Amino acid sequence: MERRPLHLHLLLFFSAWLLLLLLQGVSSLQFRREDFPDGFAFGAGTAAYQYEGAAAEDGRTPSIWDTYTHSGRHPEDGTGDVASDGYHKYKEDVKLMTEIGLEAYRFTISWSRLIPSGRGAVNPKGLQFYNNMINELVKAGIQIQVALYHSDLPQSLQDEYGGWINPKIVDDFTAYADVCFREFGDRVAHWTTVLEPNVMAQGCYDTGILPPNHCSYPFGNNCTGGNSTVEPYLFIHHNLLAHASAVRLYREKYQVAQKGIIGINMYSLWFYPLTDSAEDIGATERAKQFMYGWILHPLVFGDYPETIKKVVGSRLPFFSNHESELVTNAFDFIGLNHYSSVYTSNNNNVVKAPLQDLTADIATLFRATKNDTPTPEFLPGNTVDPQGLENALEYIRENYGNLTIYIQENGSGAPDGTLDDVERINYLQKYIAATLKAIRNGANVKGYSMWSFIDIYEIFGGYNSWHYGLVAVDFGSTERRRQPRRSASWYSDFLKNNAPIRVEDGSFVSAASHAQL
């Protein structure tokens, strides 16, 4: 028998060893709808100003969003006057939800439609609209998840006392929540008080790029008033107090009979330090405190994080003993809106000054990719990084306990509104897989809703923005014609037919068919 040279044996050995390493490094996961825990609900969402339209119909009065868009300050110079026309087409939309197989639908209520003066008399037409839509969802067997507020304060309250920067908002918000709980709570499974306050603080009250368009020089331009050094902190403080007040009301007056749950929502970016320098690592941790700790630390521990207290100093409101007790544990769940991750670095241009704004307090630069031009504001990235969602969930678990979490928004837009949205399907598969992996690693995630059910008037881009909907809307038509995208068929196959998603080596490939609805 012929002997092989030693170098050949070594070559074969190292080849086999390398192949084994490569195989071990291949991530392989195949899963179906049935692999998620009992009680887990898949859904999609919309928001009132962006979806309903009918801005001046049936007693609705202007919100701060109406004022902002009609002032011409919106970058696309459009308004939500018609939006997706959900006010008139909700029955058609619920039928589409049923055809897709949505298990849950998260929408927001327009405070200005339900209580046009901000407080006091309830608008019968507004009440009828929400009751009718909720009843359609009940008939369809779709779980109802309602958010009370998404940056659309009645303009009357903004004019009267400055809205969220005034403590009077706590009582008015609680009274508004009381109406919602009383009128709709027998059919609502989940209540979310406020959406994304942690990033609205910057956009609404520091840079002023969102309503009520508040900022102060030199921190922002072309604003209607404001003080960038203190108003972001007043906004968050009163959000937390209003949220906690509504939670206490719900628990004391409604929860036992209605058997729903209540929580608050946060925007969630994940952060990677641009370099391994101490400065960039410090900036990353600071960004996490302002993104997560600003909301979660008071809700879990009764006070703001030490990092924020140290940076902001006397500009940061404080909780009285009573308020600290009120906010602590004032939630049944936390909602996360998570889309992407960013790279973070220390903002060396920030000079410590007696008065500085929220952006300077964060003192961090953000990049969607390492080579992007940095920005000092919390702005959504466009990277596809499902590991970032897993990291965010693990960070929350390590720092605040294994809280009940609902992924309330996650999605990807298409710039041209294409119906053949394969990239969106790939994105959604990756993040749904990441959600399942996080659950298997111990995260207490109870639901996932993609953004959005239907094309809407987008916050930053209006009608000319990227389109996020499972269902396309022809905004050029007066009828606002609907047409399901390929992603709607894929989601339907996953939800209704238990079609598998296969994950191989970082590539997420659906085995589901794409039959048209």
Curated annotation (Swiss-Prot):
| Keyword Disulfide bond attributed | yes
The signal peptide here is 1-28
Instruction: State the taxonomy lineage.
Output: Eukaryota, Viridiplantae, Streptophyta, Embryophyta, Tracheophyta
| Cystine connections | 215-223
Q: Which domain of life is it from?
A: Eukaryota
Please state what the protein is called.
Beta-glucosidase 20
Pfam families referenced in this protein's UniProt entry, alphabetically: Glyco_hydro_1 (PF00232)
Q: Which UniProt keywords apply?
A: Disulfide bond, Glycoprotein, Glycosidase, Hydrolase, Signal
Glycan-carrying positions: 222, 227, 402, 410
Residue numbers annotated as active site: 196 (proton donor), 409 (nucleophile)
- In its UniProt record, which GO terms are filed under biological process? carbohydrate metabolic process
**What residues bind a beta-D-glucoside, as annotated?**
50, 150, 339, 409, 451, 468
Name the source organism: Oryza sativa subsp. japonica
Q: Which reaction does it catalyse?
A: Hydrolysis of terminal, non-reducing beta-D-glucosyl residues with release of beta-D-glucose
For the keyword Endoplasmic reticulum, the answer is: no
Q: Which family does it belong to?
A: Belongs to the glycosyl hydrolase 1 family.
In Gene Ontology terms, what is one molecular function of this protein?
beta-glucosidase activity
Q: Which Gene3D superfamilies match?
A: Glycosidases
EC number(s)? 3.2.1.21
Q: Which InterPro entries match?
A: Glyco_hydro_1, Glyco_hydro_1_N_CS, Glycoside_hydrolase_SF
